[in-house]
Amino acid sequence: MNANGFSSLETEYIRKHHRHQPAENQCSSALVKHIKAPVHLVWSLVRRFDQPQKYKPFVSRCVVRGNLEIGSLREVDVKSGLPATTSTERLELLDDEEHILSVRIVGGDHRLRNYSSIISVHPEVIDGRPGTLVIESFVVDVPEGNTKDETCYFVEALIKCNLKSLADVSERLAVQDRTEPIDQM
């Protein structure tokens, strides 16, 4: 583990896929989640730019404009309880070979200005079974009246909820995939 708490492999993936150049008025961070489900299953959820609500608990609805290609826009409705109701997001990168998705927020009634995120999905072995390492990083402007620490803490809390939900949904699907019908006598 390094000073940030990442393993050498995690650090290498972050260096390779999660390059953000935060300006003076921005904060940036990366979070890691180990999921006990195969990479193809986790990626099948993450890559769905058109259906983030499959695992993101704060999304109630999503409408996509475009053909799910770079530059496509999605209008996301946010569930009540958060300081926003809508977010407009642009697909920046969708790489099915490297398993990388990047999204930029371009509008909405929230304070996340110049928000950009990258999520990468990597195969690993957990307890002798196929598992997945998920890394999500972001950069965002620090809103007027807030500190970098406050802003990072808020965004990290949202991402942690999303990653926990991604793990829950993926692991539930993985168990269903592994469950074989028992032969009746």
Could you describe each region identified by the protein language model?
Residues 14-16, 164-185:
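Short, highly charged C-terminal tails/helix-capping segments
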Residues 34, 47-113, 173:
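Glycine-rich portal/gate segments that line the openings of hydrophobic small-molecule binding cavities
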Residues 39-40, 67, 93-99, 121-133:
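A short, structured loop/turn motif at beta-sheet edges
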Residues 42, 46, 74, 91, ...:
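Structural signal for hydrophobic/aromatic residues that build the beta-strand cores
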Residues 59-63, 151-152, 182-184:
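Short amphipathic alpha-helical segments embedded in low-complexity Lys/Glu-rich regions
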Residues 104-161:
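Beta-strand/loop substructures that line and gate deep hydrophobic ligand-binding cavities in soluble
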